[in-house]
């Protein structure tokens, strides 16, 4: 074991925790997390780490029930951050290759970029739009409208 000192190990366990989101405050970009390994204690509002928050802004909140990794300040469990989500249990990633970046939504909508094929595909229901360096392809069981100029 890397840490032989029990006190140090307990300190680290208090700083870094894995829990499940129990509520979300979308307007403040915060969430509360329940920690089953700490007698189901619920955290205070924790800030959700975002990629950008100034000139470029990114926004994505975890869902209630989502497993997350949290980091707390050394001053206690009143202030901390949700660093991100982790796949656990029956929940699996929407892709299984390092060449694709994918965002899949609950309703099945999907944004996927394949860097090996240099192609971006957006799928919503039965409609798929694929853009690469040579063409734009639209497939749909419904009406397709295009406007130039």
Question: Can you annotate each of these PLM segments?
Answer:
Residues 1-17:
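Short boundary/loop segments of OB/S1/cold-shock single-stranded nucleic-acid-binding domains
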Residues 2-5, 59, 63-67, 73-149:
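Right-handed beta-helix
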Residues 42-59:
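Beta-strand/loop nucleic-acid-binding surfaces
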Residues 21-23, 82:
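Conserved hydrophobic positions within beta-strands
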Residues 27-33:
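Short aromatic-glycine-enriched beta-strand elements
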Residues 33-44, 101, 105-107:
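Short solvent-exposed strand/turn elements
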């Amino acid at each position: 074991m890397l840490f032989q000192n029990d006190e140090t190990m307990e300190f680290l366990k208090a700083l870094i925790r894995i829990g499940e989101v129990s509520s979300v405050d979308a307007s403040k970009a915060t969430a509360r997390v329940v920690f089953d390994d700490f007698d189901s204690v619920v955290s205070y509002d924790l800030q959700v780490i975002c990629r950008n928050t100034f000139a470029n802004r990114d926004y994505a909140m975890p869902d209630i029930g989502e497993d997350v990794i949290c980091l707390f300040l050394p001053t206690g469990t009143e202030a901390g951050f949700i660093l991100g989500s982790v796949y656990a249990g029956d929940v699996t990633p929407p892709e299984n290759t390092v060449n694709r970046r994918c965002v899949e939504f609950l309703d099945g909508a999907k944004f996927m970029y394949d860097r090996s094929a240099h192609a971006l595909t957006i799928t919503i229901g039965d409609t798929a739009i694929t853009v690469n360096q040579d063409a734009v392809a639209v497939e749909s069981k419904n009406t397709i409208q295009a406007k130039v100029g």
